[in-house]
């Protein structure tokens, strides 16, 4: 199965990282892909795979430039933990508000079933989305422009 991009934008980072502490995943290692959305990108965010929303966790914070790495830990953000319906693996999506964006909109609920590409929310202008996953081959590249719900990020 494939993971599609959760956001329109530019891939700025692909690295191995520990999971978000807010979801008690700091002892697990994931592949993290960061997608920066500039003011001209569509800011609707989509589910990278079919699955069930297991957890949503909102964290207030600062409004630093979202292209900075520290924004994923300091800025206002919203976490989604999705259990992939095929692999059973957890996929984490993090919406990160930026310097201009001061509003994160969540459009799903815990326990909701999603199809790949379904709308999960949006962020207002100049923000970032991180996706964390395991056990997949990375298909995307740093510097690549991606489209939410369409561009392939990773595969089994």
Question: What are the language-model segments listed below?
Answer:
Residues 1-156:
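Contiguous, well-folded functional domains in the mature portion of proteins
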